[in-house]
Structures are given as C-alpha cells and as structure tokens.
Amino acid sequence: MATQDFLVELGTEELPPKALKPLSDAFTQGIVKGLEEAGVAFGAVESFAAPRRLAVRIRDLADAQPDKSVEKRGPAVKAAFDDSGNPTRALTGFATSLGITPDQLDTMETDKGAWLVYRTVEKGKPTVELMPDLVEKSLAALPIPKRMRWGAWKTEFVRPVHWLILLYGNKVIEAPVMNLKPGNKTRGHRFHCPKELIVPTPADYEVVLKQEGYVLADFAERREQIRAGVAALAEKEAGGKAVIDEDLLDEVTALNEWPVPLMGRFEDRFLEVPAEALISSMKEHQKYFHVVDASDNMLPLFITVANLESKDPSQVISGNEKVIRPRLSDAAFFYETDRKTRLEDRIESLKPIVFQDKLGSIYDKSVRVAALAKKIAEAINSDPALAERAAMLAKTDLVTEMVLEFTDLQGIMGQYYAANDGEHEDVAKALNEQYMPRFAGDDLPTTLTGCAVAIADRIDSLVGLFGINQPPSGTRDPFALRRASLGVLRIIIERQLPLDLQTVCEWAEQNFTVLTENNTASTVVDYMLDRFRAHYDEQGICAEVYLAVHARRPTRPLDFDRRVKAVEAFRQLPEAQALAGANKRVSNILTKQGGDSIGETVDTALLQDAAEKTLAAKVEEQAQQVLPMFEQGDYASALTSLASLREPVDTFFDEVMVMADDDAVRNNRLALLNRLRNLFLRVADISLLPTAG
C-alpha cells in the first residue's frame, strides 16, 4: 500500500500559554487514536505547538484503510428452503437486506448444522476521505473548559481560528474543517513575517516556518533553545547562573515563536527584600528568570525572553526594567509595612476568615492545630511549647500584605516575619515547614516542630471534613485531602516518627464539638492507609505486597512501611510462592472449620504422624526465634527465618490428613495450622501474595 506524509496545522490567535502543551498533546493523541480505530497504517508522529498554531505531522500514512473481509451469517440451510427447494421468506429477506440474490450466498458448516453465509471484501476508504472528519473529532474532544465563538460562525474553539492546512503528500485535502477551507499556506511571525507562506509538502513544514517565517514550530526545540540561551546569557553577561524553573520555562516557550533572551537589571536596594518575594514577582507577573552567583545569592539581574529580534535590544531591556521596578517597589513596601506588626498581633485577624462553614474560622483551626501539635510534639520527643506556639502563628502571614499579593509565599514570609519578631528559630522554620511537602517528591520538614505542625494541620483537616461527612469524592477534593494524607505518611516514615495514626486522629477528634459522623478517627485512618497503595505503587512495589500488609491494618505508618519492605524482600525468596500457597490453603481450611474459634495450643501427645511432629517442632522452634524479632519490628529477619518452614509444611500437606476422623486429633492439627498461620500474620497475610502456578 502506498504511503505519504500528512500534515494538519490549525492557525489561531494567541493560545493560552499554560494550555498550549496539553492542547497539542491531546490533539496529537486524538488523531493517533482515530487512525488506530480506522485501521490506517502510519509511521512516526510529530507534534508542533507555538503561540498561534497547533500542528501534527504523520509520516508514512497509508493512502487507504486495508480491505476488510466481511462475513454475515444468514438463516440455517434447513430454514432457508421449503420442502420443494424454493427459497423461504427468511432467505429472500436476508438476501434483500444485503442487496444480493440468494445464489451469491455460501454454505458454512458448524457443529450446530449448516448455515448460509454471505462473504465479501469491503474496500477500505481512502485516507483523504477519512482525515477531515478525524481531525474535526480530535479538535472537538480537546480539553477546553471554556470555548468561544467569533465572527458570524457558530464554530467554537479556545481562540479564533484563521487558517487551516490539510496536506497529504503535496496535495491539499479539499474538505472543510471548523468551517475553514483547507490550503497549503501558513503564516509567519506576526511582526517579522506577517504574510502567507506556502508549505509544499508536510516534510517542509517547520523548515519553511524557520527559514522564512521566523517561527520555531517545534515546542521541544524552542524550549531547549530558550534554556540554552538564558543559561549562556547569564554566564556571559554576569558570570552568574540563571535559575530555570521548569514550569516557567514551559510557559515562556508557549509565549514565544521566535525567542530572544535579554538581560535587564534592577537596583541593589531591592535585594534587601527576601529573594522569594522578588522571584515570585518576576516569575508570576513578568515571566522573568532570575540570576544567582556561585554561592546561589541572588543578583540584581533578570532575563526576559522577547518574541522578536529587535533592532534596538536596549530599548526592549529598558522597557522591561521600567515595568519590573514598580513591581519590586511594591514587594519592598509590603515587606517594610508587614514587619511593623508582629505575627502574634495578627492572630485576632484570623477570626473573620472562614476555613469551612461548619468547622469555623482559620482562628478556630489554629487553636485546634495548636492543641494537637502539642500532643504530637510530646509523642516525638520534641518541645511541645514550641509546637503549640508555631501552630498558633502558622496562618498569621495569610493576612500580611505580601501574602495577600503573592499567595505562593504563604509560610515562606511567615518564617521571615517570625524571625524578625525574634521567635525561636524552630518556630520560625515551622511556619514554612507546615506546608511541606507541597507536592510529590518535595522536601520534608527539617525540624521536629515543623513535623508536628505539618502533621497536626493535615490531620485536623482530615478529621474535621470526614467528621461532617465531606470526604473527597472521585472528582472533587477541594481541600486536597489525598495530598494531605500522603504528606503525613511521608513525614512519619521518612522522619521515622513513632506515631500511631489511630491515636493522633482520636486526639484530633477530641478538639471538635461539631462532628456528626460516628467512628470518624477510624474512618480517617482507613482512608489514609488506602493512600499507601499509590505511595508504594510509585516505588514499584506490587499491589499484592501492599494488600498483604494492609490486611493486618497496622496503624503506625513506620511499622506499616517496615512490614511492606519485609514482605517485598520475602517475595523474592525461592520459598515465597510455596509458602504463600500453603498459607492460602491453611486460611481456607481454618475458615471452613470455625476460624477465630480455633485455638493454637498444640498437644504433643496427640501428634501421630512423623510429618506433623516435625512441623510442630519446627513451628515451636521458629516461634522462639522470631517473637523477639517481632517485638523489635525486625520483620525482614523474621520472614527470612520463617521461610525455613517451607519443607516441613510441604511434607505435612503431602503426608498428613488434616481432617482426621478422631475429633481430638483433627482439632489438634487445626491448632497446629492456626499457630503456623498466626506466626506469619504477625507481619502480613502472605496468603494474598502470588502463589506457584
């Protein structure tokens, strides 16, 4: 089958920068999905995304769908003809529905008799007929929360669309998409090349735009050019290092078709303002990269990326310097003003701010968190007074001018202002660390005071919201409780804190008077333990290992984690699958025979067969060895030791009839199996692990 390259380009007004890459990815995926569903063969797929265009190129796209063999079964032969051999209504009706005559049907033999069948080959549709509808559907399915109309058309898109390329080889596909007539003409840079440019073939697309149109259409190429240019400029002009935030880099890439980095300067006096405030101002409002020296100290420099090659770059730089100066002046003013009021004097200002209608104000939450943080601090051998103080001050920076203007600085400015007020160093740090980790893989609190406040704040939210029956749903999690749960688990595990979730949640529950749900603490603990699954999935630990531990519901995260690591190590042992299978068999037997009512005291006088005597002796020997390991939380060593039971367990099941006729013998054997299983259950339910076969 012949192949040619295909190109679609949608020319628009400037697309939302944060949406550009997701739109491009979704557009590409939609076209690929459509081709796969249509059964059209294709080669490499390339995406292009710039401020005024979305494009996809498909290499080696087949010129048609493959022909398809079709088989349609009709009536049974005995129902197709009457006694005289004439076609029945069943046969003629079937043939008529297909637009054929009965003599065009074949006979198919099956185990249920002979049937008439129509066999034919459906010709595949030409690709040029398929692509317009496929592109239209891909565009309609893009994740656009708010679409707009323009002109007299009813067509909707995220921004007005002005031109369209649909090329297959060197031929334009003449079929409208989004009420636009396709062509082979694109448009260059809005200022450097404000005219139409002919794209002869799909292979010429980005070359024409780059060489004639002053447009780098490839998002990844443009992104790396900006990264390299910004880094080189910082080193060349200032001997410094540009700090490149990846999200900002994506946004700047989406704003520029022809990026040109330029360096500007601001007054040294602004460096007296915390660097985070300067960075936030430059990043959020102006999309500037900041520059640091070899010691990572901020320099009074910034790098902006212009979307054109100016004849007078100094004018562009000067313009940007004039724009940033008022922004930085505002930050300096906020910083100076905020420091005139101590954080403790702002506590009363938290009372009008609602946390949640039923759970009260931010002030109410602060009081609860302070009480809980104090208890947590005591439990982790930290200073409870510092934790209580930090929790009461934790949200006070929310009412400062700086944080009201730059919300991403919450906690960060709290630390600066607390230090300015002369608060204890750990208290000041805790005001920032309360929000850690802010995202997956983020840093954790470095101080125990910070750990106590971070955990207390999250647990208070979890218990409060679950307690008024407002847990997260499948689509809504407005208070980010999933992230809060994972944050608590990470802090406890990675900082190795001896905390029990059940206890902490019960402490939190005691601080509320408005909860309506029963067993809130246990419900929250179950929810948090369920979050462990995603935590371990990211680490490549299989679900069965998590489920084996989860079945025992250990409520100390550190203990839970040690068990998971131990079971994961046990799973790699050669004895693991056999012992998992044996545990599953034992579990089934015990469940059928009464489960919890079965004891585990073995009467050696009732042991008859050599295999059960050996197993009983080995189980008792292992019990003496592993019980101290359990007490120390050394689950890995315990499971490694218990792996030696594989051989006597296998022999027992090969040679011993558990369900003996004699009640006493039978019950004794059940007790032996129960004792065996309970040893493993001290760690996890390994019957849930994969078994041999």
Curated annotation (Swiss-Prot):
Catalysed reactions, as listed in the record: tRNA(Gly) + glycine + ATP = glycyl-tRNA(Gly) + AMP + diphosphate
Pfam families: DALR_1, tRNA_synt_2f
First-level EC class: ligase
SMART domains reported for this sequence: DALR_1
Record-listed E.C. numbers: 6.1.1.14
Location of region: Disordered: 65-84
Family annotation (SUPFAM superfamilies): HD-domain/PDEase-like
Cross-referenced PROSITE patterns: AA_TRNA_LIGASE_II_GLYAB
Compartment annotation: Cytoplasm
Compositional bias ranges of the Basic and acidic residues kind: 65-74
Main localization (coarse): cytoplasm
Coiled coil regions, renumbered to chain: none
Listed GO CC annotations: cytosol
Record text on subunit structure and interactions: Tetramer of two alpha and two beta subunits.
Family of this protein: Belongs to the class-II aminoacyl-tRNA synthetase family.
NCBIfam families given in the database record: glyS (TIGR00211)
Record protein name field: Glycine--tRNA ligase beta subunit
Biological classification of the source: Bacteria, Pseudomonadati, Pseudomonadota, Gammaproteobacteria, Pseudomonadales
